[in-house]
Amino acid sequence: MGCKVLVVDLDGTLTLSRNTYELSVEALLALRRARDAGIRVVLATANGLDFALTVARYLGVRDVIAENGCLVHIDGETHELCSGDMSEVDRAVLATGAVAPSHQNKCRRFDLAYVPLVENAVERVKAAVRPGYVVDSSGYAIHVRPAGADKGAAVRWLCERLGVSCGWVAAVGDSDVDAGMLATAWGIAVGNATEAAKRAARAVVRGPSGLGFKEAVDLILSGGACAP
């Protein structure tokens, strides 16, 4: 018996590298191999739900974790794992002058994304945000969301929903915002992952980003990953 579910990050994991948005052909072929083997694939991303669902459609994936775990779309239904109004937080963050809003914020519900304009943008945003919210970086953007929400919490929710032990779920990622799901599931970090992601994972493959994801799928299909 092997992995039943594969949760995979998008940016930096299915892409050619951590500083491009171009998808890796090797990663796409590996994703197809996992699907063909009967593994349920879930796309887990910091991106907004509409964007994530669009990308997932072209990947042949139905289930999505979006906004860093604030939203889960499974079996055609969307579930909110967060609550609250982010407008006041958004105003406080923009008032720092350290970031610019992501174009996706118009359609994001709970996890807001920002483009850093200065080197210490993360620190300045943290200082501006009141307790009860998390500020972190995916390497592509700075994210602010309600405390307690992350990809790890979403994976735990997903496991309960599917009736599957988290030990039978593999997760592959590259960044700090992936650390939660890498620790919750049978985590695999790609070779160029952040130190936080590597520490959280059960295994670290050698290849970077998309090539690393291919190695991760090889490991999964060979029976080298997942345990109850």
From Swiss-Prot:
Q: What is a single Pfam family found in this protein's UniProt entry?
A: Hydrolase_3
The reply to whether Hydrolase figures as a keyword in the UniProt entry is yes
Q: Could you give a GO molecular-function term held by this entry?
A: magnesium ion binding
Q: Which cofactor does it need?
A: Mg(2+)
Disulfide bonding pattern of the chain: none
State the Gene3D superfamilies in the record: 3.90.1070.10, HAD superfamily/HAD-like (3.40.50.1000)
List the coiled-coil residues.
none
Task: Write out the catalytic residues in the record.
Answer: 9
What enzyme category does the UniProt record give?
Answer: hydrolase
For Mg(2+), which residues are the binding ones? 9, 11, 174, 178
Kindly state which keywords UniProt assigns to this record, in alphabetical order: Carbohydrate metabolism, Hydrolase, Magnesium, Metal-binding
Q: Where does substrate bind?
A: 151
One Gene Ontology term, aspect cellular component: cytosol
Q: Which domain of life is it from?
A: Archaea
Which HAMAP family does the record associate with it?
GPH_hydrolase_arch
Please report which protein family the annotation says this sequence is part of: Belongs to the archaeal SPP-like hydrolase family.
Q: Which PANTHER family match?
A: HAD SUPERFAMILY HYDROLASE-LIKE, TYPE 3, PHOSPHOSERINE PHOSPHATASE
Q: What is this protein called?
A: Phosphoglycolate phosphatase
Organism equals Pyrobaculum neutrophilum (strain DSM 2338 / JCM 9278 / NBRC 100436 / V24Sta) (Thermoproteus neutrophilus)
Output the lineage of the source organism: Archaea, Thermoproteota, Thermoprotei, Thermoproteales, Thermoproteaceae
